[in-house]
Amino acid sequence: MIHVLKSRSTLLTASSIVRTSVGSSSRYSQTRTYSRTHSWSKDASGGAISVLPTKLPFGEQAPRFPHTLGLPLVSRPLFPGLVTSVTLTDEATIDAMEALTKNQDQAYVSCFLRKKNPTGVSEGGVILATPEVITDPSDIYHVGTFAQIQRLTRGDETAATLILLAHRRLDLEYVDKIGPPIDVTVKHWNRSDYTGADDTIRALSNEIISTIREVAQVNMLFRENLQYFPMRVDANDPFRLADFAASISASGTPEDLQAVLEEKDAEMRLHKALVLLNREREVSKLQQEISQKVEERMTEAQRKYFLTEQLKSIKKELGMERDDKDTLIEKYRKTLSEYPHVPEEAMETIDAELEKFSTLEKNSPEYNVTRSYLDWLTSVPWGVETEENFDIQKARKTLDRDHYGLDDVKDTILEFIAIGKLRGSVQGKILCLSGPPGTGKTSIAKSVADALGRQFFRFSVGGLSDVSEIKGHRRTYIGAMPGKLIQCLKATGTTNPVVLIDEIDKLGTGFRGDPASALLEVLDPGQNSTFRDYFLDVPVDISKVLFICTANELERIPGPLLDRMEVIRLSGYDLPEKVAIAEQYLVPKSMRDSGLLGVPETLKLTIDAVRSLARWYAREAGVRNLAKYIDRITRKLALQVVAESEGATLTDKSSRKSNTWEITEDNLHEYVGKPVFTSDRLYEDGPLPHGIVMGLAYTSMGGSALYIETQSIRRGLDSEGKTRGGGTLKVTGQLGDVMKESTQIASTVARARLSDIKPESNFFDINDIHMHVPEGATPKDGPSAGVTMVTSMLSLALDRPIRNDLAMTGEVSLTGKVLAVGGIKEKIMGARRAGIKCVILPAANKRDYDEIPDYLKEDLEVHYADTFDKVYEVAFSSVDST
């Protein structure tokens, strides 16, 4: 137990047992007075060494200093009679130990085991991470060892090695000073303190000696220590024997070893040491078993290798088997002989690599690299082409079988086949299918391959930012391999497949290069006949490949890349087309996938139900969501069929009858829930409010209605009754830069037009105008709402509403010209969905309107405008002034 000395000159805290005495420096002069001058010799490594005489008092003859320096130890305590080395890294501690070595009579320290290793605890901005630094006396155990400094070696300026000889145990009574190093007051143990029964001690001693010898048979460390056992430890001294046994135990934990050190009873000390030895014996046996198993496996592997090599040599002598390299070289040459035409440059490279490969040893680092290179060179189908289908009627049937509509794509493919039939050969082509999601861009590519009789390969470049995915890795890199184009030729086994490059508008860029620029060579008919992959580094002809790219937004494709493609725009499907697609493709496929084709029940999804699905649940341009809703319906039907079937089985199998389930417009909500959409129109009945006009928008999801709302706020008056300042324009609705510019142009055109219609009006001078485009969470941009904005402002300024069944689109110039816009078909489809009867289009878009199917034009009044005067005439003609 450690006592805390209380005196008038001592400061005590609850967490410390540190004693400091005023005027007591002379009492501790042997440990506190250090000198930096010392004579040193050199060891073999060049470090400075301080050596004390070897003939010094040992054990009980060693002095008993009550006040010494304290030295913390890590991992293992120091047992009496043993020698250990301690590495010091704290400069103050090294200086203190160096001072002690000056006087051999004072070269003693008290060693205590730390309870835990230092982990770099920060205190006051200083990292306390060295083992010899103690900041809290409770960090060390209070039973330690009185040790003599035998030797101190300085390796460099920051570290030193201390050799210690342990003499006896001691108790820590006080910590006089927190260092580093610490000053401690100790109480030495006496031999008279030990007790124990002679017979029991003798039995335990014999068992320890027997266990040590048993462990030494399998443990080399024990065997080496046992050689010095007779000289170092008296077998009749149970205390030294227990200390020796504990000190050579490698499996003992610091707590277990400290327990042996603290034990005063000889019998208990021997017993605890024996427990450590028994644990060491079990660990040694386990290590021996593991070592034997590993050795047996290695011996067996070596034996198999030796026999295998002998067998290979015998077979080779008898001509029964050839060397692996010879077999591979023969396989490569046989593969090359089967190709119709290998380019001269490629053949020269292959011959050179085969010659190098024949000289390489199997264990050479170059062996696998060369073999991989030859594997890829011989895997390219040099000159191999798939025989194509030139039957126009068969190709048309294949395309019509898989897809409804898409006439532009089908006609282009049929033209491609016709040219090939006339020429007798087919060159490659680069098509780009652009349109909203779910319109069949990806799936039509597979149908094109089937119609042509070609192999099909698809890879997506969405988010791709590494050029190596296109052009391969250079062979200097570990794990290098060719790019997707060469992988495509190997996978299809032909040089004229149909290759689908999906999501080309979503190419990324990064520090590994620009994939869009890498595709310029791939998609250029004038260059791709000698495409050179970084890995192969030989020209490969990919000019006969039919490339089909897909994109949602052409604006995101770089101009030079887009210029190399033949763009085919796929507009969204209108309501009749969606119903036809669902009836001919989606419903039968969903029934088949749900296992409902062979059931005795009658299942029916009415046309009205499909129409309601397309109108109120899946209004996007494609049919992907429509297919999801149909799948949801068939899954619920499958559950009902199985439930009915199991119910009939439980009652009477013979009583089961065919049931009829009919999905109609009335019970559709029971299967798919409430409608997602209600109406495209914000204002249903009657004339529109002043300042409200419906425009038409075109997005990646198709066409839709786009309202423009304008409201005026009267400006305040000054003291003379005049309006302060001029009118301002505020726009909201998350508009893009182009659309914001359109609002400024529309404001100017509206002001100019108002001055012509009503010269006396000062509406825009005395009012602030706020223009808003509803659905503010949706970003909007583009110039096609120009005429709609001008009409909205004039409706507000003239205090006249416009027709409720009118929608318009067109860009307006500063002089009032109405300019052409895109997406006419999609906008007409959006207008019909919103119930619009009258549409104003730019005159330049008349040719686009003429190409729209006739059923979309039915009951639709269309006006063409080349200037805003025509727009004004149509918009306000049938509405009386209010």
From Swiss-Prot:
Pfam families: AAA (PF00004), Lon_C (PF05362), Lon_lid (PF22667), LON_substr_bdg (PF02190). Its EC number is 3.4.21.53. Residues 1-34 form a transit peptide. ATP binds at G435, P436, P437, G438, T439, G440, K441, T442. Its main location: mitochondrion. It catalyses: Hydrolysis of proteins in presence of ATP. This is Lon protease homolog, mitochondrial.
